[in-house]
Amino acid sequence: MLKVSVLAGTPVDTQMGVDFLERKNRHAPEDRQLEVLYRPVAVDCDSQIRFQYSDNDEKRQVMDAIFDADIENGVRDFFIYCNSLSGAFDFDRYEMQKSIDSGEDIHIITPLKIYRSLGRGYRRLGVIAANNLSAHSIEEALMSSNRDLYVIGSGNMAIVRAIEEGYEPSAIIESCGLADMDRYMEACGAEAILLGCTHFPYLKDEFEKVCGLPLIDPADMMYEKLMESFILQG
């Protein structure tokens, strides 16, 4: 059984990541089962925002506390189930450093790694993110594989807060104007909308009812990357 630590910005989206992997466990063969660990970085949205805009030394201290303990406990795979977190910290460099420091092959799977290949498939793409720091990081990742890609982006923490507070998807879609956002992005030529926050799959079924564009959820592609790591570890 492969140990996987799920990191995200708040307890809510961390639990969403844990739930996502545990649903995958129910359909996976016995030799592909995961032991999923819950590792929130902050206690709520406000603390998460402060963390994301803190200096790199402070971020690293938080990450070291989580990673060092889990690596000591046999974890080699880390699943960053948070777009804004993956854009606020250099996990690529950190993955290499932790592998060197520990002498182990550490794998960190992030949404941004998925986006670096996703950009090749589109000419114009809409992005809805939790905040504009995240939207910027997603745009950079998408364009790293396609410099001609045109990104129509939006960051809206109000959507995240409403999800954390437990509002119904239909109410959030109405109050946050997501149907209007879809029409705006479609008018700008977007071919699809990327759900650039791991909270947003909570809205997906209801959003599809009012959305004229296909919705992209990167979580399944992240899981496929995790399974590749599983296979490599034998």
Where are these regions (language model features)?
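Non-catalytic structural scaffold of enzyme domains
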Residues: 1-234
